[in-house]
């Protein structure tokens, strides 16, 4: 069993489920960032959605708030949660990052496989309406909470966003 676990090699060359299909890519020009493949799905259910991919341009210096998002999978078992982060810009736009299991077509998520590192991971960059929308509208058992983050120190918001993008 251990030998099988160690033989599993991560790859970007697989048939992925549509919402994990594209990897975001950031291009930097000083303070300016252009982020491609930002997911902006319109979710009706977890299997019925309008697929949209977009790009977003922004200045790192315009990040004014950071939001922490916690999704408790089952409120009766609160210790199990998924954490996301959302960056708010001075113009009101929000860009969220969720580190997720990158599922292949036909693959079903299981927490035990996750603990044994049997999935590839993907930084999903998305509109906040996408990543919170799917949780609020489509995942009936889960509870999602949004908390304003406190980041101490000058320039911390910008540095945190840049560290996630690199």
Task: Pin down the residues of each PLM region.
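Alpha-helical transmembrane signal-anchor/signal-peptide segments
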Residues: 8-29
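Intramembrane catalytic core of multi-pass membrane enzymes that act on lipidic substrates
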Residues: 33, 37-39
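Active-site nucleophile-His-acid catalytic modules used for acyl/amide transfer and hydrolysis
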Residues: 129-166
């Amino acid at each position: 069993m251990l030998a099988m676990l160690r033989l599993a090699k991560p790859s970007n060359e697989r048939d992925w489920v549509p919402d994990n299909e594209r990897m975001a890519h950031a291009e930097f020009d000083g303070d300016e960032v252009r982020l491609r493949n930002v997911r902006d799905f319109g979710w009706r259910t977890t299997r019925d959605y309008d697929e949209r991919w977009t790009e977003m341009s922004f200045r790192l210096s315009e990040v004014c708030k950071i939001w922490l998002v916690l999704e408790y999978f089952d409120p009766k078992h609160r210790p199990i949660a998924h954490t996301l982060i959302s960056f708010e810009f001075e113009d009101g736009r929000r860009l969220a990052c969720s580190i997720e299991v990158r599922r292949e077509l036909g693959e079903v998520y299981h927490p035990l496989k996750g603990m044994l590192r049997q999935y590839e991971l993907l930084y999903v960059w998305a509109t906040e309406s996408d990543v919170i929308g799917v949780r609020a509208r489509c995942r009936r058992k889960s509870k999602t909470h949004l908390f304003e983050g406190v980041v101490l120190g000058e320039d911390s918001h910008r540095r945190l966003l840049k560290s996630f993008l690199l």
